[in-house]
């Protein structure tokens, strides 16, 4: 089957956007399957640098159809703004479609996200405050408004009336905030419906036909496996599954249709927001890596937390995704380091463990067990053949492959398409 899932192997920000952009030139479809505009993908190509939050990274190829699947929650304002910016920069967006089953991020979701984070105080989860979590809560509480509802004014009004009655009770009585106007939000939704009507499709049928015609489909993941609500650092995670299995649910296909799962790993670890991170570097080395790599969130602008590569977490990520191959990004950032460490195990309560604990409290107590490897202290940015990489760099890649149990099919040594080395 011609479906390839591309997923993040860490806490997000691994470089999936570049990988999708790179592989999309041979694809017929690129489909986003999870998350919302809380995830940011940076793509650098001959047209310039683009920061995408909701539109799939395959949009830069005119022949590729890009679908935002039912598993994504969509803020129409963000989609419209992103679409219009792409158009203004000469990108053809006529092949961008949205599933009518996808749920909406509405103004009250954003408002509640901020109020809930404020109420948590120093126990806040570090959300992006873009309303993603509350939108998924409504989806599973059967209070959500879906994209297709925008095209059915009477049904939309009925749904909004019911939902706002509940939301305004929470806003006024729990948070002492002003209520949301039904008329205002209804008018906003009607405007969105007119604006999005050409993009809204019954996408499961489109994808089913594509599979039957043996078309090449990329399932584009958002965020990373270690943020999964079941297998990640709960509750410090995201609200939808970024795993390959989540891709099947998020676009409407069966697992047998997926022929390959490609995991994307940085050569080191990063994380945004709260939650345990065993290999976090709070010293000068972390600052050096952050500055060299410009590690600041695409969506939030917050400085990312930096750590050494965590092979325990990486192996777990390979397992729960069923990765068939992987790609390492940002190897070039390690060029400046005289020595590099890899976490091969954890020490928990005086015992050495090689598994990823389910409990975030336990994970926070884990001390990394490191294996130190020599750096190479020379630039890899201009290398175009794997054999021409410094021996120490190849040894580093090989050791990570051994530890996570998955082979790297390519290594990225810079942001552009040309800075990708295939093994």
Swiss-Prot record:
Active-site residues, Swiss-Prot/TrEMBL: 13, 41
Cellular component terms per the entry's GO annotation: cytoplasm
Sequence positions that bind Mg(2+): 13, 40
Species of the source: Dehalococcoides mccartyi (strain ATCC BAA-2266 / KCTC 15142 / 195)
Biological function: Plays an important role in the de novo pathway of purine nucleotide biosynthesis. Catalyzes the first committed step in the biosynthesis of AMP from IMP.
Binding-site residues, IMP: 13-16, 38-41, 128, 142, 223, 238, 302
Pathway: Purine metabolism; AMP biosynthesis via de novo pathway; AMP from IMP: step 1/2
Binding site for substrate: 298-304
Protein name as catalogued: Adenylosuccinate synthetase
Lineage of the species this protein comes from: Bacteria, Bacillati, Chloroflexota, Dehalococcoidia, Dehalococcoidales
């Amino acid at each position: 089957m011609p479906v390839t899932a591309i997923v993040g192997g860490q806490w997000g920000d691994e470089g999936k956007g570049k990988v999708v952009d790179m592989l999309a030139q041979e694809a017929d479809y690129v489909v986003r399957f999870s998350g919302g505009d809380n995830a940011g993908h940076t793509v650098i190509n001959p047209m310039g640098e683009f920061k995408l939050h909701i539109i799939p990274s395959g949009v830069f190829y005119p022949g590729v159809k890009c679908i935002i699947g039912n598993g994504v929650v969509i803020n129409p304002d963000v989609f419209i703004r992103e679409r219009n910016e792409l158009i203004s920069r000469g990108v053809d967006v006529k092949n961008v479609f949205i599933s009518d089953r996808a749920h909406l991020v509405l103004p009250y979701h954003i408002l509640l996200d901020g109020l809930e984070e404020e109420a948590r105080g120093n126990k806040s989860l570090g959300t992006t405050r873009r309303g993603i979590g509350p939108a998924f809560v409504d989806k599973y509480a059967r209070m959500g408004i879906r994209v297709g509802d925008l095209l059915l004014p009477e049904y939309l009004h009925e749904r909004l009336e019911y939902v706002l009655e509940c939301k305004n009770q929470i806003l006024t009585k729990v948070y002492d905030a002003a209520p949301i106007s039904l008329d205002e939000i209804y008018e906003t939704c009607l405007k969105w419906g007119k604006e999005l009507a050409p993009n809204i499709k019954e996408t499961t049928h489109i994808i089913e036909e594509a599979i039957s015609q043996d078309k090449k489909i990329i399932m584009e993941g958002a965020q990373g496996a270690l943020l999964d609500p079941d297998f990640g650092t709960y509750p410090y995670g995201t609200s939808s599954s970024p795993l390959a299995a989540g891709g099947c649910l998020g676009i409407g296909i069966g697992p047998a249709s997926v022929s390959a799962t490609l995991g994307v790993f940085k050569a080191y670890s990063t994380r945004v927001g709260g939650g345990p991170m065993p290999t976090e570097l709070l010293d000068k080395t972390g600052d050096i890596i952050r500055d060299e790599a410009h590690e600041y969130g695409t969506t939030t602008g917050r400085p990312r937390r930096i750590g050494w590569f965590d092979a325990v977490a990486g192996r777990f990520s390979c397992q729960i995704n069923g990765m068939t191959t992987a790609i390492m990004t940002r190897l070039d950032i390690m060029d400046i380091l005289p020595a590099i460490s890899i976490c091969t195990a954890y020490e928990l309560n005086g015992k050495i463990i090689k598994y990823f604990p389910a409990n975030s409290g336990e994970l926070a107590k884990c001390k990394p067990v490191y294996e130190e490897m020599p750096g190479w202290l020379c630039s890899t940015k201009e290398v175009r053949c794997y054999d021409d990489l410094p021996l120490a760099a190849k040894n580093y890649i090989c050791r990570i492959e051994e530890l996570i149990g998955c082979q790297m099919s390519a290594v990225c040594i810079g942001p552009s398409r040309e800075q990708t080395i295939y093994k």
